Amino acid sequence: MAKKSKIAKNEKRKEIVARYAERRAELKAIISNPNTSDEDRLDAQFELNSQPRDAAAVRVRNRDSHDGRPRGYLRKFGLSRVRMREMAHRGELPGVRKSSW
């Protein structure tokens, strides 16, 4: 199981990303728009750089929803491969069954 502090830090990052997401999207649209003046583009870049580092979505780590394991994460289930396998064997995941061919 992951350290509780790492899980808490990741949750805090998710909140910060959600708080700044709309403004970041606006600034990125201004920067990428070819019709934007150089001055406006520069202002948008400065504002984007002045935002907190954790406001970027790439700073959030996908973690297992049960124990916070950071590796082997399966998006479809929100679980790590280890936890998904355990739950599938116990029949706790609807629609999942062992394959055979």
Swiss-Prot record:
Residues 53-72 are annotated as: Disordered. Pfam families: Ribosomal_S14 (PF00253). SUPFAM superfamilies: Glucocorticoid receptor-like (DNA-binding domain). The keyword RNA-binding applies. Keywords: Ribonucleoprotein, Ribosomal protein, RNA-binding, rRNA-binding. Belongs to the universal ribosomal protein uS14 family. Binds 16S rRNA, required for the assembly of 30S particles and may also be responsible for determining the conformation of the 16S rRNA at the A site. This is Small ribosomal subunit protein uS14. It comes from Corynebacterium glutamicum (strain ATCC 13032 / DSM 20300 / JCM 1318 / BCRC 11384 / CCUG 27702 / LMG 3730 / NBRC 12168 / NCIMB 10025 / NRRL B-2784 / 534).
